[in-house]
Amino acid sequence: MKKKLVCAYIIGYGIFPEWYSVLTPCKEATETNCYITWASFKRGYVPEQGSLLVGKTCVNPISWTIDTLPASTSGGMLLSVKAKKRFKSTAQIHNNYLWVKTNTPFVQTWNVLHLMDYNLYWMDIRKNVALRVAEYLKKK
């Protein structure tokens, strides 16, 4: 099964590596046969201990790495399908969850950004899916 998996995007939940005996977290943008996970919080916010959103693994949805270097994107969400402006975000892994800073107006007041785990990085996710699928097909 693992060899047939391009990538599992398990977004918004705390994942513990020991849950998957054959899958490991993705460590780079083109890696296949691995999983990606993150839970988003406002930069500087520390979630409650024991939160179901925080696990032992986090992949940065901009750099697609597991290091703690900050990364920036302008491929974030739109407020509507017709909107032309995309909102910018930065993401940095901190204690196995994602610290986020964004200029998205209504999100700036939230601490827990779980509802926005996909939206903040929708263009980054789309590009990454295409990249991983191409890499997977190249290996076949």
Where are the regions that the model predicts?
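Surface cap/lid and interfacial helix-loop subdomains adjacent to catalytic sites
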Residues: 1-135, 139-140
